[in-house]
């Protein structure tokens, strides 16, 4: 018999529990307390870290969940570290349900089911009252757009973090130049397009390089999302923050 959804503000279910675990683990090191928005289209998070150096824009699509019930917009405040403490026990073949009951609107519930073990675990976590400051992202036309294997990007960032604090990224035609300098060494890596590697969907003219300098500390945090997808999407524009997009498995 189908569950009565009338008692829930939110009730969603996914078999992609591993992707949710990886996502929350990555977010907890960038965001502490943040708002998450549920509505009929999906799950959304737009927030900056405490230093306002990083903007996170996450969207999970309702139609990609096994079931999705959220008849009206619901905004909740959560502590990401506490959420990860509950969800880190999940394994890839678990089924995760996330719910908020009408009679307990100040708690979020996580139900983890494992068919193989015939087990069910339910957590309920207190929600936070966080002011809802809406962040609007204006449309931007980028000068360079590319895809790159996420595992290779992670390795490059890790290697350069051992040398310096910042990475200079320069797009020249169909090549990508990565540089970093430290007290004891420097590194320069030049990447060109390959069938299974770097691929430009929009390239700059060779005489008009597109470049910027970015913090390796934050890029290293981003690479915790590596296992979510095989490719990252990178968007570069002069005098503009670096945009890196990870697909959250098949969810968004």
PLM feature spans:
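DNA polymerase sliding clamps and clamp-related checkpoint/processivity subunits
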Residues: 1-28, 33-162, 168-252
């Amino acid at each position: 018999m189908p569950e009565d959804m009338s008692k829930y503000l939110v009730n969603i279910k996914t078999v992609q529990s591993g992707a949710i675990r990886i996502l929350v683990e990555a977010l907890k090191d960038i965001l502490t307390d943040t708002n998450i928005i549920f509505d009929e289209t999906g799950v959304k998070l737009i927030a900056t870290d405490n230093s306002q150096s990083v903007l996170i824009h996450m969207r999970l699509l309702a139609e990609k969940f096994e079931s999705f019930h959220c008849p009206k917009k619901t905004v909740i405040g959560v502590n990401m570290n506490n959420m990860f403490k509950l969800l880190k026990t999940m394994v890839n073949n678990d089924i995760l349900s996330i719910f908020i009951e009408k009679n307990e609107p100040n708690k979020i519930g996580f139900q983890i089911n494992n068919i193989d073990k015939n087990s069910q675990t339910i957590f309920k976590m207190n929600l936070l009252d966080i002011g809802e400051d809406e962040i609007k992202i204006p449309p931007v036309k980028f000068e360079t757009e590319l895809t790159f294997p996420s595992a290779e990007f992670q390795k490059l960032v890790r290697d350069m973090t051992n040398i310096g604090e910042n990475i200079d990224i320069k797009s020249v035609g169909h090549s990508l130049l990565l540089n970093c300098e430290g007290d004891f060494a420097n590194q320069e890596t030049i990447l060109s397009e390959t069938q299974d590697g770097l691929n430009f969907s929009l390239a700059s003219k060779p005489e008009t390089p597109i470049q910027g300098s970015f913090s390796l500390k934050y890029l290293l945090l981003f690479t915790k999302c590596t296992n979510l997808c095989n490719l990252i999407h990178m968007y570069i524009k002069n005098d503009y923050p670096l945009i890196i997009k990870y697909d959250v498995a098949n969810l968004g």
